[in-house]
C-alpha cells in the first residue's frame, strides 16, 4: 500500500465524526449568579411534569446557557439547583410545538445549604467553547497534596513525555498561565511540579495569540499552545499557603511549600520544594497507560517567585525568578540493533552517569498602553547556570545477537565465547568528566501604533541576545579491536586521553517593522521586514596525552572537577601537551533578512491567512581545525509559503486546516570537505554538494461539543514530508565496528500523526462517563548504507507504525469514584535490508481504581493495574508487572485544613522502566534505574486568610489538600475530598552516592 492510500484511509477514518441531532422542542434559558452577576455554569437543570415527575435534565454550560427537550406541548416545572444556592422552580408552558425561551434566571446564595448540601450532579469533565478545551478540575480525582502535573496526566488527550514536555491533543504546550496571567515563563516543568492542584477550579487548553496579533487585533497565525489554570473563586483575594512535608522509608523525602498573596491588582506567589523521589510522587501514571519512563535517581531543590500586576488601564507587568538545583544518578542499560545493510551490528552498553547543576532564571514583561492607539511591550530575561558531569561506561559491539548466547553480553564468559566464535568486534571503556558555566541574557522591545480604528497598524520590534559559556572536559577512551590486528599480529588497541578547554561567546541583534493595511471589510494586507545579525566565536584548546601510554591515569578516581588529580601526574608542563591539530577555533557571522507578505481575512465564521516569507542570508565562516584553515563566504535564499484556514461551525465546533513549507540550509560543518577522525568509531566527512531541504507540513484539527450528555470530540491530523532531506550515508567497517558518516540529500522521509478523542457522560447528571483516545503514528526513515568503501551504496528504508488506544469508564458521586481503564500500544518496525530483524512489540495496561471519602474527613484510595510487554529481544523485558498503589488520608480541625496521609507506591515491587527509540540508523532499547517501591507519610497544612479573617469553609470538593473554596455565596467546589495515588509510581533503590568534588 503506497503512502497516498495510507493517508486517504486515515483521513476517511478521522473525518467520520458523530453527527449532532437536533431537538424538535426545547426549553432554554440563561442562569445568573445573583451575588457576582456572572453566568452560572454547571448548575443542575431539570424539567418536571405538572405532577413533579422527571421528564428531562441537563447542566448549564460555561456561559450559563441550558436547553432541555420537551417531548410534547403542556405545562412543566423548570427546577434549577446548584450547590450553595437556593433552588428555584419556574412554571413553563410549551404550546404550538414551538421552542420556549425562559430568559435569565437568577440564583441566590444559601448559607445553610452551602454548609450541608449533598451534591447530586457532577460537573462535566470537559467543555468546548470556540477553540478552547475547558476541563473541570472537580471532575478529576487526584491524590491529596498533588500538584497540577497529576491533574494534567488524567485529562483526556493529555500526554507528558519522559523529559517533562506536555502535549494536549497532539500539540506541545509552550507556556503555563494562571488566571490568564503569565506564570514562570520559559519553564513549564517548574509550574507543573509546584503549583498545588487543590487551588485549581478549571484547566483551559488553547492556542494563545502572539504579542503582535494581540495588540494589532489581526490574527497572524503564530500561536503557541498554553495551559491556563483557573483558580477557585475566592482564592484570588488575601493570603493563602499550602505546606506538604513527607518522609518515607529508604531515606525518601518530599517537602513542598507554596504561599500566595493577592491585593487589588497585585498578586505574588512563592514556592519552595526539595525531594529525592525523582519529582514523580503524587501522580506517577495516567489511567489506562504506562505513564512516564523514570530515568535515574534525582535529588532536586527549587525556590521561585512569580508576580503579576495589572491596573486595568495602562500598566501591566509580570516577573518571575527561580533557582533550581539537581543531583542526578543515572544508570542506563542500552541494547542497540543497527540497520547497517546486510551486516548485523549489535551494541550493548552500560553507563553510570552522575550530574549536578545550579541555575538561576529571571524574566520580566512590561506592557504600557497609554491610550487606545499606543502599545509598548518590553521583555528582558537573564539566565545563569553551572553544571558538573561524570560518566563511566563500558560497551561491546557484536556481529551476531549476543542474547542468543546468554543473558549477560558484557560478562567475561560470554565475551570470551563470542571472541572465540569471531563475533566479538570491539570492546571499550570510557570516562568523561565535564564542567560548564553559562551566562545568557535576552531582551526585546515592541512598539505598536494604531493608525486607525479599522486595523491599520505599524509595529517596530527590537531584540538582542548575549551568551558567554565556558566548558572543560577530561576524557579517557580505551578501545580494543578483536578483528583488526596491529603490526605484531595482535588485537589492535586505540587509546585517547584528552583535556579540552572550550570558551564560547555569542551575541546578536535584530530589528523588525510590520505594517498592516485594511484593503476590504475585515481583510488586511500585512508587510513585514526583519534584519538579524549574529556572531558566534568558539576557541577550543585540546591537550593530548597519548604519548603517556595506556593505563597512565588508571589510578585516578573520577570525581567532579577532578582536573588537578589527572594533571598532577603529568611528566611535563601542561602546555607541552597542547595539540594544535585537535584544537579548534571557529567564528561564524550571519546577516539574515526576512521579508513577509500576508493577506489576512477575519470574518465572523471563518478566517483565512495566506502569504509567503523570503529569507536571503549572507554568512561568513572561519575555522582552524585538523591543520586546515577555512575562510569562506556563503549566500543562500530560502522561502516559506503559509496557508491557514479556520471555520467556526458553532461556538463549540471548529475546523482548522494549515499548510506551511519551509527550507532548511545545511550547516557550515556539513558543507566543509573535511574528514574528522578524532573519534575513530564515529568519523564524519563533509559534503560541499549538499542542497537545502524543504519540508511540507499539513495540519488538520476539528473539535465539537454537544451539551446534552456533555459530549465532546476532537480529531487531529499532522503530516510532514521532506524533499531533499539532509540524511546520512553510513559506511560501516565490520572489522572495527566503526562508522564513517557523510551527510547527503535523500528523499523518502515522512511522518504522519493522527488521533481521535471522544468523551461523554452516559447520564444527564454526569455520574457515568466514558473517554476514549486513539492515536496513529506512521514514520518512514530513509538512509544510505555501505559495507565498505569498495562496495555498492544501498538505500535503506525503515518503516515504523505505532497504534494506541486508551479507554476509561468511570462512575463518580459525592463520596465514591470507581474507574475501569485499559490501553494497548502496538509498534511495528520494518527494515528493508534486514527483514529478519523486523519486530512487533505490544504494551498492554488494564486495571481500575477506587476512591472512597467519608463525611468525617477520611479518604481511602487504591488502584491496581497490570502492565505487560511483548516482542522485545531481551526476554527479561517481555514481562507482566502488577502495579498496586494505595493511600489513606485523614483531615482534621475545623474546615479540615490539616491532613495526614500515608502513600504506598508499587507495593508488589514490580515496576521497571524501559524506553525504545527507532530511527533511520537502528533501534535502541534502554532500561533505567529508578525509584520503585517506597512509602511516604505526609503532613499537609493549608491556611487561608481572605479579607483579614481566617477562612475555614465547610464545603468540600475533591481529594487535593483537603477542602477549599471561596467565601460564602461564591461557586463552591463540586466533589468530595479523596483521590487516588499515582498509577505508575516511582520506585527503586536509594541513591548510589555522588562522587566527590568541590561544591559550587
Predicted region positions:
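A short, solvent-exposed loop/turn motif at the edges and junctions
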Residues: 48-54, 75-90
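Short, acidic Ser/Thr/Gly-rich low-complexity loop/linker segments typical of extracellular
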Residues: 50-65
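Short, surface-exposed beta-strand/beta-hairpin micro-motifs centered on an aromatic residue
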Residues: 61-70, 165, 191
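Periplasmic plug
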Residues: 128, 165-213, 226-231, 266
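Primarily recognizes Gram-negative and organellar outer-membrane beta-barrels
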Residues: 186, 209-251, 265-1000
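Structural motif
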Residues: 30-40
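Short, polar/charged loop or turn motifs at beta-strand boundaries
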Residues: 132-154, 167-168, 178-183, 244-249, ...
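Short, acidic, small-residue-rich periplasmic hinge/interaction motif at the N-terminus
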Residues: 32, 46-48, 81-85, 95, ...
Amino acid at each position: 500500500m503506497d503512502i497516498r492510500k495510507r493517508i486517504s484511509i486515515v483521513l476517511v477514518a478521522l473525518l467520520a465524526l458523530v453527527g449532532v441531532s437536533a431537538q424538535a422542542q426545547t426549553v432554554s434559558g440563561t442562569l445568573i449568579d445573583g451575588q457576582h452577576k456572572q453566568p452560572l455554569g454547571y448548575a443542575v437543570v431539570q424539567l418536571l411534569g405538572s405532577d413533579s415527575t422527571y421528564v428531562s435534565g441537563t447542566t448549564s454550560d460555561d456561559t450559563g446557557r441550558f436547553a432541555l427537550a420537551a417531548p410534547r406541548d403542556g405545562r412543566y416545572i423548570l427546577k434549577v439547583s446548584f450547590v450553595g444556592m437556593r433552588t428555584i422552580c419556574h412554571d413553563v408552558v410549551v404550546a404550538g410545538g414551538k421552542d420556549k425561551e425562559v430568559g435569565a434566571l437568577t440564583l441566590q446564595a444559601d448559607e445553610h445549604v452551602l454548609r450541608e448540601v449533598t451534591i447530586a450532579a457532577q460537573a462535566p469533565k470537559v467543555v468546548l467553547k470556540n477553540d478552547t478545551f475547558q476541563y473541570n478540575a472537580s471532575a478529576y480525582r487526584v491524590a491529596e497534596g498533588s500538584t497540577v502535573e497529576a491533574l494534567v496526566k488524567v485529562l483526556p488527550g493529555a500526554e507528558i513525555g519522559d523529559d517533562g514536555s506536555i502535549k494536549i491533543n497532539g500539540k506541545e504546550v509552550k507556556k503555563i498561565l494562571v488566571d490568564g496571567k503569565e506564570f514562570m515563563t520559559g519553564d513549564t516543568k517548574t509550574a507543573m511540579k509546584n503549583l498545588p492542584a487543590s487551588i485549581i477550579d478549571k484547566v483551559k487548553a488553547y492556542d494563545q495569540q502572539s504579542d503582535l496579533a494581540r495588540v494589532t487585533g489581526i490574527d497572524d497565525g503564530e500561536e503557541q499552545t498554553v495551559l491556563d489554570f483557573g483558580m477557585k473563586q475566592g482564592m484570588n483575594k488575601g493570603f493563602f499557603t499550602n505546606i506538604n512535608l513527607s518522609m518515607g522509608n529508604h531515606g525518601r523525602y518530599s517537602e513542598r511549600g507554596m504561599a500566595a498573596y493577592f491585593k487589588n491588582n497585585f498578586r505574588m506567589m512563592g514556592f519552595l520544594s526539595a525531594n529525592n523521589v525523582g519529582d514523580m510522587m503524587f501522580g506517577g501514571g495516567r489511567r489506562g497507560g504506562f505513564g512516564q519512563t523514570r530515568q535515574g535517581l534525582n535529588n532536586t531543590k527549587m525556590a521561585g517567585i512569580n508576580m503579576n500586576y495589572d491596573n486595568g488601564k495602562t500598566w501591566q507587568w509580570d516577573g518571575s525568578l527561580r533557582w533550581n538545583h539537581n543531583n542526578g544518578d543515572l544508570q542506563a542499560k542500552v541494547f542497540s540493533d543497527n540497520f547497517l545493510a546486510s551486516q548485523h551490528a549489535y551494541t550493548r552498553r552500560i553507563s553510570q552517569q552522575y550530574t549536578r547543576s545550579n541555575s538561576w532564571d529571571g524574566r520580566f514583561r512590561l506592557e504600557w498602553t497609554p491610550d487606545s492607539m499606543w502599545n509598548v511591550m518590553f521583555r528582558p530575561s537573564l539566565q545563569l547556570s553551572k553544571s558538573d558531569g561524570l560518566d563511566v561506561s563500558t560497551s561491546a559491539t557484536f556481529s551476531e545477537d549476543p542474547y542468543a548466547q546468554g543473558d549477560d553480553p558484557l560478562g567475561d564468559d560470554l565475551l570470551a565465547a563470542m571472541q572465540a566464535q569471531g563475533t566479538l568486534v570491539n570492546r571499550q571503556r570510557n570516562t568523561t568528566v565535564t564542567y560548564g558555566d553559562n551566562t545568557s541574557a535576552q531582551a526585546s522591545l515592541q512598539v505598536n501604533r494604531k493608525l486607525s480604528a479599522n486595523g491599520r497598524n505599524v509595529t517596530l520590534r527590537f531584540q538582542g541576545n548575549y551568551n558567554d559559556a565556558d566548558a572543560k572536559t577530561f576524557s579517557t577512551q580505551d578501545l580494543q579491536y578483536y578483528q583488526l590486528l596491529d603490526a605484531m599480529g595482535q588485537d589492535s588497541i586505540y587509546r585517547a586521553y584528552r583535556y579540552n578547554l572550550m570558551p564560547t561567546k555569542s551575541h546578536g541583534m535584530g530589528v523588525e517593522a510590520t505594517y498592516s493595511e485594511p484593503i476590504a471589510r475585515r481583510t488586511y494586507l500585512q508587510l513585514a521586514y526583519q534584519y538579524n545579525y549574529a556572531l558566534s566565536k568558539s576557541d577550543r584548546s585540546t591537550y593530548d596525552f597519548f604519548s603517556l601510554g595506556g593505563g597512565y591515569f588508571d589510578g585516578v578516581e573520577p570525581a567532579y572537577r577532578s582536573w588537578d588529580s589527572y594533571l598532577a601526574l603529568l611528566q611535563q608542563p601542561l602546555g607541552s601537551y597542547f595539540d594544535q591539530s585537535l584544537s579548534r577555533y571557529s567564528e561564524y557571522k550571519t546577516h539574515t533578512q526576512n521579508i513577509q507578505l500576508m493577506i489576512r481575512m477575519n470574518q465572523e465564521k471563518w478566517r483565512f491567512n495566506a502569504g509567503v516569507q523570503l529569507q536571503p542570508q549572507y554568512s561568513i565562516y572561519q575555522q582552524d581545525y585538523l591543520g586546515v584553515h577555512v575562510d569562506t563566504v556563503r549566500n543562500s535564499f530560502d522561502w516559506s509559503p503559509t496557508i491557514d484556514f479556520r471555520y467556526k461551525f458553532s461556538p463549540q465546533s471548529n475546523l482548522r486546516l494549515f499548510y506551511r513549507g519551509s527550507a532548511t540550509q545545511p550547516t557550515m560543518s556539513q558543507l566543509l570537505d573535511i574528514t574528522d577522525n578524532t573519534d575513530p568509531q564515529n568519523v564524519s566527512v563533509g559534503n560541499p554538494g549538499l542542497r537545502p531541504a524543504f519540508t511540507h507540513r499539513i495540519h488538520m484539527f476539528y473539535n465539537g461539543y454537544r451539551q446534552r450528555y456533555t459530549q465532546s470530540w476532537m480529531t487531529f491530523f499532522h503530516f510532514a514530508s521532506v524533499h531533499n532531506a539532509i540524511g546520512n550515508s553510513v559506511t560501516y567497517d565490520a572489522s572495527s565496528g566503526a562508522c564513517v558518516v557523510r551527510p547527503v540529500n535523500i528523499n523518502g522521509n515522512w511522518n504522519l500523526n493522527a488521533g481521535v478523542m471522544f468523551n461523554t457522560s452516559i447520564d444527564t447528571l454526569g455520574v457515568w462517563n466514558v473517554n476514549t483516545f486513539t492515536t496513529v503514528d506512521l514514520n518512514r526513515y530513509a538512509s544510505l548504507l555501505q559495507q565498505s568503501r569498495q562496495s555498492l551504496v544501498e538505500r535503506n528504508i525503515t518503516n515504523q507504525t505505532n497504534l494506541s488506544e486508551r479507554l476509561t469508564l468511570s462512575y463518580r458521586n459525592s463520596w465514591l469514584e470507581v474507574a475501569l481503564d485499559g490501553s494497548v500500544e502496538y509498534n511495528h518496525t520494518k527494515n528493508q535490508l534486514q527483514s529478519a530483524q523486523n519486530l512487533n512489540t505490544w504494551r498492554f495496561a488494564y486495571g481500575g481504581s477506587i476512591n472512597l471519602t467519608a463525611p468525617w474527613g477520611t479518604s481511602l484510595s487504591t488502584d491496581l493495574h497490570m502492565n505487560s510487554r511483548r516482542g522485545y529481544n531481551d526476554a527479561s523485558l517481555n514481562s507482566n508487572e502488577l502495579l498496586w498503589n494505595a493511600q489513606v488520608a485523614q483531615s482534621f480541625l475545623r474546615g479540615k485544613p490539616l491532613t495526614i496521609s500515608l502513600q504506598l507506591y508499587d507495593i508488589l515491587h514490580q515496576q521497571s522502566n524501559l524506553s525504545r527509540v527507532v530511527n533511520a540508523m537502528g533501534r535502541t532499547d534502554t532500561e533505567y534505574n529508578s525509584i520503585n517501591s517506597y512509602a511516604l507519610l505526609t503532613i499537609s497544612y493549608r491556611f487561608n486568610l481572605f479579607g483579614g479573617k481566617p477562612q475555614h469553609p465547610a464545603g468540600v470538593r475533591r481529594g487535593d489538600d483537603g477542602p477549599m473554596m471561596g467565601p460564602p455565596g461564591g461557586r463552591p467546589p463540586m466533589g468530595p475530598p479523596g483521590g487516588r495515588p499515582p498509577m505508575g509510581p516511582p520506585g527503586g533503590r536509594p541513591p548510589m552516592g555522588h562522587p566527590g568534588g568541590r561544591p559550587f
